Amino acid sequence: MKKLFAVMLAVLMTLSACAFAEGQTTYKVGICNYVDDASLNQIVANIQDQLAALGEENGVTFEIDYKNCNADSSVLNQIIANFIANDVDLMVGVATPVAMAMQSATEDAGIPVVFAAVSDPLATELVESLEAPGANITGTSDYLDTAAVMNLIFAADPEADMIGLLYDIGQDASTTPIAAAKAYLDEKGVAYKEYTGTNVTEVIMAADALIADGVDAVFTPTDNTIMTAELSIYEALAEAGIPHYTGADSFALNGALLGYGVDYANLGVVTADMVYDILVNGADPAVTPVRTFDNGTATVNTETAEALGLDFEALSAAFAPFCTRVQSIVTAESFD
């Protein structure tokens, strides 16, 4: 059935491409963000800026309808329903929960979906393969190299013998990297404790618990729930002498010691390029490969490093064998 749908969708997209080629110059794009955090907001800003630039360069107009569901599934479903009712030409889903909801709502409607910052599109069954997604959806992935983050933890502190794993158990983006972290630590013979939270209050309580348990370091993947709480927990962690290693530079911006991962500004630009290719050039999402990125940049918060008694230059030297670049940042609420 899914293969039949893919064939039918390909025909539909081909017909749509013909219509576009006949002179359509205005496209309605519905963008939904999952939650208000530095990384996701940076993605949205770069999608909008790049679409505006591409439109100006090529004589087309993108009418953007931007919404944020603030992690509320009922609001998310209503946003998507409104996009469909308003006859958008394409939807952009920022983060895994939004992409999954959009795919579910649009498969029969034939509306193309481009996702942004989906950590594991295969495990969540958004796509059949990264090379050929197989339906009306494709996009960009911020897949995290968990072993690399683990390597950085032990490069900074070879004697660490208890690691805290802090995440939201309901976040699909955390499932694979947390499993990978456990496997890494098991193989290394290092103990770990799990701490979870589904909102800011619960995350603060989880952080207090890991401080009380005296872990040597904390790992969080690209988890949007923990991201929204980082500004509320980073000072307590630093005061307790516990470094927080994470899967995105926005965590470091908000006070974590380290964020390791993709360049989200570039991810937003590439996402916009894919939107343009589908709408203007008639590219078929079913055979448009998911874009992945080098996530070898380690972003160190120098203020937090100082609070922990760590020297940035020494950290950079220790991290160098395990990443392609080490850069510094200071604490702020959002990227400039």
Please report, for each region that a protein language model flagged, where it lies by residue.
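Beta-alpha junction/loop-to-helix N-cap segments that form part of ligand/metal-binding clefts
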Residues: 65-128, 223-247
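Short, low-complexity disordered leader/linker segments with a strong preference
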Residues: 1-28, 53, 57, 333-336
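Short beta-strand elements in bilobed, periplasmic/extracellular small-molecule ligand-binding domains
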Residues: 54-73, 136-137, 184-200
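Extracytoplasmic "Venus flytrap"
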Residues: 28-54, 65-74, 170-174, 223-228
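Hinge/cleft segment of the Venus flytrap/periplasmic-binding protein
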Residues: 277-336
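Hydrophobic alpha-helical segments within soluble ligand-binding/sensing domains
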Residues: 120-162, 262-283
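Pocket-lining segment of extracytoplasmic ligand-binding domains
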Residues: 172-244, 248
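An alpha-beta-alpha
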Residues: 29, 47, 138-188, 284, ...
